[in-house]
Design a protein with these regions (language model features):
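Conserved alpha/beta-domain cores
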Residues: 1-189, 195-197, 203-205, 217-219
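Gly/Pro- and small hydrophobic-enriched strand-loop and loop-to-helix capping segments
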Residues: 207-225
């Protein structure tokens, strides 16, 4: 696995921030997504001042969080980890010591498990606004009830999250607009939408949080074969 050079990340981050400034997105929070990269990507992000990191897989998040702690990061000053992938309920207990924000809560069973292992946690509801069967997320008409149910568990529901449709700018913009409308109706301030390939569309639609991986760290290394 290639080593991530913090200088390269800093250069890409400067370019990204310049791009965001040009499209009115200077207020948008960046979640640095280290999926598929080694712990050095997380360390490089921290070196560049990126304090919010995102992971898609439970095992990767736990391993990187523990690596940073072992390398000398104090738990109080360690990065804020967001879990942004599809999550099985049985993984919650192992992640609870590390995760600050659970971005992909899409069913009550998962919320109940989070409330049991990490009471009062910050959560976002993932919504499948593109109606693609292969994607996780609750349906738009289910959002209001799920938010109410999660709130009744004393979870801190702060926003909504979605993934756009790949390769279709018009449909992605429509999906992002739909998410913003849902968040507005529910008075939820955070709209986590937009990744490396569609962040400009997301910002135009009203994103408050981008999940950025390859735009910061370069192409992901190929998965190791057994």
């Amino acid at each position: 696995m290639s080593v991530i050079d913090p200088a390269d990340v800093a250069r890409r981050l400067d370019q990204l921030r310049n791009d965001l400034d040009a499209i009115g997105g200077d207020h948008v929070e960046i979640v640095a997504v280290t999926k598929g990269f080694g712990p050095d990507a997380a360390q490089a992000a921290i070196t560049c001042g990126l304090t919010v990191l995102g992971e898609n897989y439970a095992q990767e998040l736990a391993a990187k969080a523990e690596h940073l702690l072992a390398a000398g990061e104090e738990r109080e000053t360690a990065p804020e980890w967001h879990f942004i992938g599809h999550l099985q309920s049985n993984k919650v207990a192992s992640l609870a010591p590390h995760v600050a924000v659970w971005q992909t809560v899409d069913r009550l069973k998962l919320g109940t498990r989070i409330a049991a292992h990490s009471p009062g946690s910050r959560v976002y509801v993932q919504v499948n606004v593109t109606d693609e069967p292969q994607k996780a997320g609750c349906q738009p008409h289910e959002v209001g009830q799920l938010v109410a149910d999660l709130t009744s568990l004393d979870l801190d529901v702060q926003g909504l999250m979605t993934v756009g449709r790949q390769g279709d700018v018009s449909e992605t913009r429509s999906a992002f607009d739909h998410l913003v409308s849902l968040a507005d109706d529910l008075e939820l301030p955070t709209r986590s939408m937009g990744m490396s390939a569609d962040y400009a569309v997301a910002v135009a639609a009203g994103s408050t949080m981008l999940r950025i991986g390859s735009k910061l760290f370069g192409p992901r290394p190929p998965k190791a074969t057994p």
